[in-house]
């Protein structure tokens, strides 16, 4: 189910945002926020937070920076392979983290 929504969002980003002239009030944009939520949360949580974000993207809110906040369970497995950092997880409190995309990863791997 996630792959279908990711495909629809990428289609929107590539073909339909031409009509909106970059009108998102937040960084990351609402569509990018949705992709990050789908990558880091369960499907239903991602849809819920994305809908809330879209409802806040209007003239009644100031906008600004609004990174996804997720709960992350620490993995105790040790991996000795080379790692690829796609997202940075910035700790907040009580096991919640801000999700920030690693921009260098995209330059080197896509």
From Swiss-Prot:
InterPro entries, per database record: Membr_insert_effic_factor_YidD (IPR002696)
Cell compartment(s), UniProt: Cell inner membrane
GO cellular component: plasma membrane
Residues in the signal sequence: none
Membrane topology: Peripheral membrane protein
Keyword terms of this UniProt record: Cell inner membrane, Cell membrane, Membrane
Location (main, coarse): membrane
One Pfam entry name: YidD
Functional summary from the UniProt entry: Could be involved in insertion of integral membrane proteins into the membrane.
NCBIfam families cross-referenced by the UniProt entry: membrane protein insertion efficiency factor YidD (TIGR00278)
Protein family per UniProt: Belongs to the UPF0161 family.
Protein name, UniProt field: Putative membrane protein insertion efficiency factor
Species annotation: Aliarcobacter butzleri (strain RM4018) (Arcobacter butzleri)
């Amino acid at each position: 189910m996630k792959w279908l929504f990711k495909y629809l969002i990428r289609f929107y980003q590539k073909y339909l945002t031409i009509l909106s002239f970059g009108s998102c009030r937040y960084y990351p944009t609402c569509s990018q926020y949705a992709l990050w939520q789908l990558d880091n949360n369960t499907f239903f949580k991602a849809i819920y937070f994305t809908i809330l974000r879209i409802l806040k993207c209007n003239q009644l809110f100031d906008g600004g920076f609004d990174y996804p906040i997720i709960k992350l369970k620490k993995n105790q497995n040790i991996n000795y392979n080379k790692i690829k950092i796609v997202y940075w997880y910035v700790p907040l409190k009580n096991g919640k983290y801000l999700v920030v995309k690693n921009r260098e990863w995209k330059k080197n791997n896509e």
